[in-house]
């Protein structure tokens, strides 16, 4: 059963990927895959062009059954700006439903145009509260890693590159 679906979201320049799924752990909490990849470039195993399960997708372009939205309580109000979509997807996955990225439709998105950047002390404080709230709600996946992401790949970049050799332990598979 597919519950949440998201498409390829391109940045305002119309030629590069802005959102193509979310990996828990990118940037410490969660981040988007393939940021800045040009639409003509190949991605890691061409994943940017393949439908696939992810732990989360962006709400910039998300579809979900209303019944599931109601069952999980919708978006968490304590996550007013950041991580509310990721938290929602995590709640959906907890029900045993799938979160799927499908690159068949493309949306052009002007990220942060309406709300702006975290460029004031108040916005930075809100963002830090939302990081703490998300971390408190989902400590296990933050500790154990994203089940849809190979632990031998880096969490510092969104390009699926190998981790630093010093940090690679025995493969989990």
Language model feature labels by segment:
Residues 1-9, 171-173:
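Single conserved hydrophobic/aromatic residue that forms the stacking wall/gate
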Residues 57, 81-87:
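Acidic donor-binding loop at a coil-to-helix junction in glycosyltransferase catalytic cores
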Residues 98:
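Residue-level detector of anion-binding/catalytic polar loops
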Residues 140, 146-156, 163-172:
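Boundary detector for helix-to-coil junctions that initiate low-complexity/charged tails
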Residues 6-72, 95, 106-118, 122-128, ...:
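Acidic/His-rich active-site region of diverse nucleotide-sugar glycosyltransferases
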Residues 129-130, 136-143:
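Catalytic cores of secreted or luminal carbohydrate-active enzymes
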């Amino acid at each position: 059963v597919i519950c949440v679906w998201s498409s390829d979201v391109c940045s305002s320049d119309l030629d590069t990927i802005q959102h193509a799924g979310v990996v828990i752990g990118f940037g410490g909490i969660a981040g988007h895959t393939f940021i800045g990849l040009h639409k003509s470039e190949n991605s890691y195993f061409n994943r940017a062009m393949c439908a696939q399960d992810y732990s989360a997708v962006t709400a910039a372009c998300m579809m979900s059954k209303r019944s599931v939205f109601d069952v999980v309580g919708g978006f968490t109000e304590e996550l007013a700006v950041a991580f509310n979509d990721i938290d929602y997807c995590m709640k959906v996955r907890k029900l045993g439903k799938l979160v799927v990225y499908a690159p068949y439709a493309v949306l052009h998105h002007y990220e942060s145009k309406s709300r702006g950047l975290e460029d004031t002390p108040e916005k930075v404080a809100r963002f830090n509260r939302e990081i703490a709230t998300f971390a408190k709600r989902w400590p296990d996946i933050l500790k154990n890693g994203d089940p849809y992401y190979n632990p031998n790949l880096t969490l510092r970049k969104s390009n699926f590159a190998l981790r630093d050799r010093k940090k690679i332990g025995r493969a989990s598979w």
